[in-house]
Amino acid sequence: MDPNCSCSPVGSCACAGSCKCKECKCTSCKKSCCSCCPVGCAKCAQGCICKGTSDKCSCCA
């Protein structure tokens, strides 16, 4: 289990503030700790579920 993102196979997730998109394993977790990626960031868009608009994405690097 990821120390930054406590996710069970089923059910909800609890993410720490340090959780990054790539460390999130399930939908509710991604929603709670991923920012929305800018248009054109294909790599980020594949792994993130947006919760809001942002010009930066932590998993886009």
UniProtKB/Swiss-Prot annotation:
Residues binding a divalent metal cation 4: 33-34, 44, 48
GO biological process: cellular response to cadmium ion; cellular response to copper ion; cellular response to erythropoietin; cellular response to zinc ion; detoxification of copper ion; intracellular zinc ion homeostasis; negative regulation of growth; response to metal ion
Binding site for a divalent metal cation 5: 34, 36-37, 50
Binding positions (a divalent metal cation 2): 7, 13, 15, 26
Residues where a divalent metal cation 7 binds: 50, 57, 59-60
Record text on subunit structure and interactions: Monomer. Interacts with FAM168A.
Protein name: Metallothionein-1X
Organism per entry: Homo sapiens
Name of the encoding gene: MT1X
